[in-house]
Amino acid sequence: MIRTMLQGKLHRVKVTHADLHYEGSCAIDQDFLDAAGILENEAIDIWNVTNGKRFSTYAIAAERGSRIISVNGAAAHCASVGDIVIIASFVNMPDEEARTWRPNVAYFEGDNEMKRTAKAIPVQVA
């Protein structure tokens, strides 16, 4: 059996740009991509914490150290500058591998300041 697992996640990054007329994609600081193990041109899901919208696009690399999160093209209808979003990528793998798999997670605060990275997501009770 093949399972689809969380590969990498940027947790609570802030949208810095939204360009409706750009070709598409989401430009992400290369340091952030590296931290989450997301590759340029990889499919990503974006979950907008601010407005509840969920959408898919692909990642492109923004300048390393820029802290840019730029939602482009039609996806710009789903996010505005200042919105808090979660960006995730997924990977398919055999069941045996999936049982021990740990995703790459980067946590952010403020103006896209990376606070820490982890290989697990802690259980939280609401």
UniProtKB/Swiss-Prot annotation:
Cofactor details (free text): Binds 1 pyruvoyl group covalently per subunit.
Enzyme Commission code(s) on record: 4.1.1.11
Predominant location: cytoplasm
Keywords attached to this entry: Autocatalytic cleavage, Cytoplasm, Decarboxylase, Lyase, Pantothenate biosynthesis, Pyruvate, Schiff base, Zymogen
Subcellular location(s) per record: Cytoplasm
SUPFAM superfamilies found in the cross-reference section: ADC-like
Record GO biological process: alanine biosynthetic process; pantothenate biosynthetic process
Residues that coordinate or bind substrate: 57, 73-75
Gene3D superfamilies linked to this entry: 2.40.40.20
Family (UniProt): Belongs to the PanD family.
HAMAP family reported in the protein's UniProt record: PanD
Protein name, UniProt field: Aspartate 1-decarboxylase
Taxonomic source organism: Escherichia coli O6:K15:H31 (strain 536 / UPEC)
